[in-house]
Amino acid sequence: MKKKTGIIIGCAVLVLVIAAAAFFGIRITDLERQNAYIDQVNELAETVDTEYISEIDRDAFNTIIDSRVCKGKYAKLENAVKSYYKAIYEIQFQSEDALQNSSYDQMLMPENLKADGPEFEKSRAELAQLSETVDSCISQYNELTAEEKAKQYFAETGLSKKYESLFNDAVSITSGTSENAYIESLQSPKKTISAISAVLDYLTETKNQWSVDGEKIVFNNKDAADKYGEYIAALEAAHANQ
């Protein structure tokens, strides 16, 4: 009986050793997967860590944002974070492209004054579209960065609260102290667009009082010229903050 008891005890010890080895194996695997996830978050954060949106390497951004390297539950976490980042930066890229591709900063040049004046229908339409795009991007960004919206991305993973802090830490890189940086960056262009629109309105209103002479706009009375100068001063003030 002692021999059988020894065998039973030996088997029990062996089972415990195997269980312990399996437990530590699981722990190591989980840690490796967590580290892989953290590496992806850090790489993504470094890619977008620029002073201006225009400085982001979009090829590098798209490569990492579309890749999926994590495994297990961290794969769901990675997908949630990258989906959130993609949505956030697609909005910013949209407004950046709209501003960069627009000719709004050329609308008061002599060539455009002659070609599109005095009604400036083409210029007005472009300004209206640009303003609508910028306002839409601001609205979408505000909605997406709302706390409840960010939580929704995590909720869709179906993961337990245990993983929530990892998600929150990752997406907080897009908020925190820089939460309003994007919105603030659009305020000056918005003011510039508004100021240009005001100048065009004034030129249409006074279309019989000015003409383009070479590289200059010439008014046929001082009051009209002085008022035009005030509009230009307002435009320069708005543009100076860009």
Over which residues does each language-model region extend?
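Short, flexible coil/linker elements and helix-boundary hinge sites characteristic
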Residues: 25, 90, 158, 239-242
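Leu/Val/Ala/Ile-rich N-terminal alpha-helices, chiefly Sec-type signal peptides and the beginnings
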Residues: 6-11, 20-120
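Positively charged n-region of N-terminal signal peptides that target proteins for export
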Residues: 1-5
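Hydrophobic core
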Residues: 16-18
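Detector for Asparagine
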Residues: 35, 42, 62, 79, ...
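A cross-kingdom marker for long, charged
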Residues: 205-242
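Extended amphipathic alpha-helical interaction segments
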Residues: 100-212
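Generic surface-pattern signal
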Residues: 43-53, 66, 70, 82, ...
